[in-house]
Amino acid sequence: GMSISNPSNFYSFVNNQIDPAPNSYAGKELSFVREMSKQTQKFGEVIKAANAKVTTQSPYPTSNSLADQLKIVARLIKGGLKTKIYMVNYGGFDTHSNQTVAGDTSIGYHATLLGNVSNAIKAFMDDLKFQGVEERVIE
């Protein structure tokens, strides 16, 4: 790993290739970092282009971080990316208190989390259908 305190300096460091990397271990590492930076920039441009192709989507629930992530995934799928697997994350399930209300498992923190998951997935599937790309996703 590496720590970057100033992104502008890092950008200049990896893109300023007036001086070739020295023929040393550090030079090999510098060449690797420069190449990864170039590839990341190219991949970023492809992702931006795919995202820009989508101008309308069906509605998603608000205040739902999983729905926000799935909305982006739907845009990238519709935008033409050939990515086979997208990874999203929705935490908060490791609770040990107030998971449900005694006598009613449909009320409580855990029930709310599961409701958010359900609403996010439904919105995602509805959006894929709206976009005409539902056949590109395995349920």
Where on the chain are the PLM-derived regions?
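His/Asp/Glu-rich metal/cofactor-coordinating catalytic motifs and the adjacent surface-exposed loops
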Residues: 133
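Acidic/histidine-rich, metal-coordinating catalytic segments
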Residues: 136-139
